[in-house]
Amino acid sequence: MLAPHQEEWTQNAERTVQVLNRLLEPVAVDIQHIGSTAIPSIHAKPIIDLVVGVRNLDDIAPYVELLKQHDIVFRGEDVAGQLLFVMGDFEKDTRTHHIHVVRWNGTEWNNYINFRDYLNRFPDKAIEYDVCKKKLAAQFADDRGSYTTGKQELIDRLLEEAHAWRSGT
């Protein structure tokens, strides 16, 4: 489930960001590599998370078919205020990328960016998160829902700290 950081994740993310920038140039304000694969000091599921910031979620609708032509498949609004696209080998049910489309500079955008930057800036916080993830991965090896739920309390606390750090308070 979890693997040590691999440099190829960063390189793959950079290539995918370039493709998305080209395809979504008129509507994407910014595209960033996020999630655990963007934090070199921690283990991660080998799925690259990217966030695409747009001014309005409706702006992405005209691009769904174009993205599909590039094997980027729309999965809907996975959580309120976010659209999810995925890449991978769907015959093998293997996802390689999760692409979250959110309102640029909105709550979701800031949460993703602040969390990544905070853990990259404070190695002790990254280690705390990594230890939690590894413990939960061992405990819930076949239950992704429980694994995700188990991390939430720590994620919420780290997000609070990240926002305070970012705002300088």
Language model features with spans:
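Short histidine-centered catalytic/ligand-binding loop motif
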Residues: 1-7, 52, 115-119
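Conserved catalytic core of two-metal-ion nucleotidyltransferases
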Residues: 71-106
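Short amphipathic alpha-helical segments
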Residues: 46-50, 95-97, 115
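Short amphipathic alpha-helices in soluble, non-transmembrane regions
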Residues: 62-70
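Helical scaffold of the NTase/Pol beta-like nucleotidyltransferase catalytic core
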Residues: 1-32, 156
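Active-site nucleotide-donor binding segment shared across nucleotidyl transfer reactions
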Residues: 20-61
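Catalytic cores of NTP-dependent nucleotidyl/adenyl transfer enzymes across multiple folds
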Residues: 107-169
